[in-house]
């Protein structure tokens, strides 16, 4: 068994993938939405996990800062809450966001997962089904806005982006910081 997780993976490794059509494992799937098929329609990879996009929230800390999830309904309300929490981080004992960084252990959060959001919507709107040579950047302003919000309202200063690590972020979240 090996992972073939996207259309490019199927192009690269499709010759090694068996046709799973009609197999017991495929019959156990509750949705076919995440399966990968080749040009003939043969199922070559099944969706065994699903990564969703969003912000992981410590609801207890959010409440300690005086907010409920229902208070945050769009980017403007997220920004207002994050900036308020960041301004009071010293008194609260935690910051709006865990450390933001671009070292090898954490850059995937921002250069991969976060970047997937504007790309998903651009590709959806443009009907893109394969890796394009270029992007239009239709949603990059949204990416910049959330990236700026993260780096300006986290426990690591924007000047420490090259040294803040994923381990720091995980430790902060895990210890309620």
Regions found by a protein language model. Name each.
Residues 1-2, 92, 175-177:
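Alpha-to-beta junction loops
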Residues 3-53, 109, 115:
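Hinge/lid segment of periplasmic solute-binding proteins
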Residues 7-10, 14-17, 59, 75, ...:
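Extracytoplasmic/secreted envelope proteins and their assembly/folding machinery
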Residues 19-29, 71, 97, 101-104, ...:
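Short, solvent-exposed loop/beta-turn-alpha elements that line the ligand-binding surface or hinge
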Residues 44-48, 53, 79-132:
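Extracytoplasmic/periplasmic solute-binding protein
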Residues 60-71, 155-156:
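Aromatic-glycine-rich donor-binding/catalytic loop that engages nucleotide-sugar donors
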Residues 73-77, 161-175:
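Short helix-initiation/N-cap motifs at beta->coil->alpha
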Residues 82-83, 128-163:
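Glycine-centered hinge/linker elements that transmit conformational signals in sensory
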